[in-house]
Design a protein with these regions (language model features):
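Juxtamembrane/disordered regions of integral membrane proteins
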Residues: 1-158
């Protein structure tokens, strides 16, 4: 892809779909003692109980995170390995920013609640792994998309 921002957006969607499928399978405890899919918790962030809304919000965030990756770290990605590594690091950053700060605060919980509330530690670790995998897949996808775009540009010049 010619544009690093387009590559970042598409890579974010690819990583976001994988992470979203993981969140769909992971359950989080609810205040009433029940449980719900993590994607349902994502929907609650925007005041909805619809899984479709949760998916839409999650994928929108994935695009934004992918574009920010392209802007901030895209120049450091030299190949598949560095793309996956920088992406994994970016995923950890977003686990802290999104999973431990923004999401709990938007749900009326204290910052870092997934690490400190009883019964939430497994959710925090699942979220950590999900963000790590999201980042690695996003970074790898970014590297592949940028490489393919650069090859295409070189062929069109020849």
């Amino acid at each position: 892809m010619n544009s690093k921002f387009t590559a970042g957006a598409v890579a974010g969607i690819i990583g976001g779909i994988v992470f979203g499928m993981m969140m769909q399978m992971m359950n989080a405890p609810t205040p009433d003692g029940g449980s719900m899919p993590m994607m349902g918790m994502v929907a609650k962030v925007v005041g909805s109980s619809s899984l479709a809304v949760g998916w839409a919000y999650h994928l929108l965030n994935s695009v934004v995170i992918g574009v920010l990756f392209a802007l901030i770290l895209g120049g450091r990605v030299g190949g598949k390995g560095s793309g996956a590594a920088w992406g994994a690091a970016w995923g950890i950053v977003w686990w802290i920013v999104g999973g431990l700060l923004i999401m709990p605060l938007m749900l009326g919980m204290p910052a870092f609640a997934p690490l400190t509330m009883p019964g939430m530690q497994s959710v925090a670790m699942g979220s950590f792994m999900g963000h790590l995998i999201f980042g690695a897949i996003m970074g790898l996808s970014f590297a592949l998309l940028r490489h393919a775009g650069q090859e295409g540009m070189q062929r069109s010049r020849a």
